[in-house]
Amino acid sequence: MAHSLGGFGVLIPEIERFNILGSIFASSLFPERAPKGCVLLTNYVGGARAPHLADETTDRLVALTVADLRRMLGVSGSPVFQHVTVYRHAIPQYEMDFGTHLQNMNDIEQHAPGLLLQGHYRDGTGLSDS
């Protein structure tokens, strides 16, 4: 592996033209997750940029990902472990008018005391302040 894998991982901007959207360096964060001499990477492909990839075979997704990892991180060799999960609608992509929807949710909460609207559809996919 040419890259040191220091840090949390990497997000890939669209202009770079990779299939991978991002990669988490799991074994850098949690060394016990990979045997000595191996690394564990969690990779994300497809998304709103390339939704057609959700229809690809597992073998094709692995091949595309490994090819990107070779170019991006200098990965050599072949995977000794792989697991592919396809989530067709995993992370919401907010539309330009999302602010209007957010305001509507705020208005509804103000007119219905005790009703709280929470979740990824409102506050994003990470941890929020709520």
Q: How does the language model describe each region?
A:
Residues A63-D68:
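Short, well-ordered amphipathic alpha-helical segments that serve as non-catalytic structural scaffolds
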Residues S23, N43, L69, Q82, ...:
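Hydrophobic, well-ordered secondary-structure elements that form the walls
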Residues G119-S130:
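A conserved FAD-binding loop/helix module that cradles the flavin
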Residues L29-K36, Y87-L117, Y121:
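FAD-binding beta-loop-beta segment adjacent to the flavin cofactor pocket
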Residues L5, G74-Y87:
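A short coil-to-beta-strand element that immediately follows conserved catalytic motifs
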Residues M1-L41, A48-D55, D59, R71-M72:
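Mid-domain catalytic core of redox enzymes
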